[in-house]
Design a protein with these regions (language model features):
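A structural signal for beta-rich interaction modules in eukaryotic proteins
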Residues: 2-340
Length: 340
């Protein structure tokens, strides 16, 4: 089927064209992935957030500053750990401001996670809290599954020696090597908290000398496209034509009920910066959003751009054309894979 005229207008020489025109009729184009309400997990359906997802134009600057501060804090902390000293510059941390929740907050063991990407490594940081005062956990590690399937290799684990009522929280680090032949690995990882459990003697307040090996399964941890991207502000029109590789695909997103929802979802899913307030549609029917990011490639950070032309029809949902410019075809296809 043909792509709607609203999504098929030509680019200008200096960059993207202006907002598309309303279509005169006909069904939306179906080139690319067709993703409806029952489209399954992964891709854009996995990235749909609740109210307030994404960044609005009103709070973009504040959120960006907050993100940069948090990124700097992560970089400083990781640089202070001797085992990571040779890893070089931290390229991205995801999520930057608040970790992924891998357990419910009311459980006996609370686990959250950050994903830190370096040029040749990924470091998984697991924040672990023991809420049981009558139990001491020793030699706490996280056993990560699903690495081999993604072309990743675990190098070592930095455990937590002890979690007790005096020091209930700590951090486990799992160092993973990136395969140079698979520069952008995507994975769904299983996480098993493993430790020696010792009961505390109520009379002495000391742990029993003997304990037993125990483990606790948490939620899965996804490594996705956004984990390799860092938002960046730049001049979109000037940069667009300087990037040599390009790719474009059209998607019918029948599960998204508005252009506002589409913008919020894409900002969250791609991990890129919406430029010039383009994450806030002025027209409920047609809109163009421009995004910029730095992609964590094996050689360092590389600039990537995305232009999203969207059209909403109440009977069809949102039809979207995603066009990407990047230094390589591989990088372009990687960005598109966030939706496909």
């Amino acid at each position: 089927e043909s792509v709607p005229r609203a999504l098929d207008e030509p680019e200008t020489e200096s960059g993207p064209a202006s907002d598309p025109l309303l279509p005169t009729g006909g069904a939306p184009g179906t080139a690319g992935a067709m993703m409806g309400v029952d489209g399954g997990t992964g891709g854009i359906m996995a990235g749909i957030g609740g109210e307030g997802a994404g960044l609005s134009a009103a709070n973009t600057m504040g959120a960006e500053a907050s993100g940069l501060d948090a990124y700097a804090d992560h970089a400083t902390e990781l640089a202070s750990i001797a085992e990571f000293a040779s890893y070089g510059k931290l390229l991205t941390t995801s999520p930057v401001n608040a970790p992924v929740q891998l357990t419910e907050s009311e459980t006996e063991y609370i686990v959250t996670a950050y994903k830190h990407v370096f040029a040749e490594h990924i470091v998984l940081q697991y924040n672990v809290t023991n809420t049981l005062a009558e139990i001491v956990l020793e030699d706490v590690v996280v056993v990560v599954g699903g690495l081999m399937e993604a072309g990743l290799e675990e190098e070592f684990i930095l455990p937590i020696p002890c979690l007790s009522s005096a020091t209930p929280s700590g951090k486990v680090y799992v160092s993973i090597r990136r395969d140079p032949s698979l520069p952008f690995p995507l994975a769904t990882l299983t996480n098993t908290l493993r430790f020696v459990s010792k009961e505390v003697d109520p009379s002495s307040g000391e742990p029993e000398p003997e304990g037993y090996q125990d483990e606790y399964q948490t939620e899965e941890l996804d490594v996705g496209v956004a984990d390799f991207l860092q938002p960046v502000e730049l001049d979109f029109a000037m940069t667009w034509d300087t990037l040599p590789a390009s790719a474009s695909e059209t998607f019918a997103l029948t599960a998204l009920e508005s252009l506002d929802a589409s913008c919020s979802t894409l900002v969250e899913l791609l991990g890129m910066q919406a430029l010039g307030g383009t994450d806030v549609p002025a027209n409920p029917s047609v809109h163009t959003m421009m995004l910029a990011g730095l992609l964590a490639c094996p050689g360092g950070l590389e600039t990537v751009l995305a232009r999203v032309r969207m059209m909403h029809q109440p009977s069809e949902g949102v039809t979207m054309e995603l066009s990407v410019r990047a230094p390589s075809d591989e990088a372009c296809l990687f960005i598109l894979s966030a939706i496909a």
